[in-house]
């Protein structure tokens, strides 16, 4: 009973092995025979081959750099959005005044603007 299940598998495997033995793969060296051996290249041919390889590499890197700059330009435009609301303008003006220094700072009265401004009160200015 087990031999009947095993018999088709055995026949199929024998057929596959017979077909694999009768087929011959193409020789691997035949494809390489057409290209010249690097050891037999003249110095001029080797120099031209090296120049072509370097030129292709430089062109490939230049195209990659150009593509990278294009993708960075589009993504940075999406990341930096102009904020023209009153809160953003006020914060930008407060930052400008705090960075300006010198004479403006001596006459500058602190306002209730900035990251630490909310809920902060100064008692010395309320007099």
UniProtKB/Swiss-Prot annotation:
What Gene3D superfamilies does the entry give?
A: 6.10.250.2190
Q: Which Pfam families match?
A: Calc_CGRP_IAPP
Q: Where in the cell is it found?
A: Secreted
UniProt keyword terms in alphabetical order: Amidation, Cleavage on pair of basic residues, Disulfide bond, Hormone, Secreted, Signal
Question: Which ranges does the record mark as transmembrane?
Answer: none
Q: Key word Secreted present in the record?
A: yes
Residues that make up the propeptide removed upon maturation: 26-79, 124-127
Q: Which GO terms describe its cellular component?
A: extracellular region; extracellular space
Record-annotated disulphide pairs: 83-88
Q: Which residues carry this modification: Phenylalanine amide?
A: 118
* Tissue specificity: Expressed in spinal cord, pituitary and thalamus.
Q: Name one GO biological process term.
A: calcitonin gene-related peptide receptor signaling pathway
Q: What is its main location?
A: secreted
User: SMART domains recorded for this chain?
Assistant: CALCITONIN (SM00113)
Q: Which GO terms fall under molecular function for this chain's record?
A: calcitonin receptor binding; hormone activity; neuropeptide hormone activity
Leader peptide range in chain numbering: 1-25
Record flagged with keyword Transmembrane: no
What's this protein's function?
Answer: CALCB/CGRP2 is a peptide hormone that induces vasodilation mediated by the CALCRL-RAMP1 receptor complex. Dilates a variety of vessels including the coronary, cerebral and systemic vasculature. Its abundance in the CNS also points toward a neurotransmitter or neuromodulator role.
PANTHER family, per database record? CALCITONIN GENE-RELATED PEPTIDE 2, CALCITONIN-RELATED
Family note: Belongs to the calcitonin family.
> What is the name of the protein in this document?
Calcitonin gene-related peptide 2
Originating species? Homo sapiens
> What gene codes for this chain?
CALCB
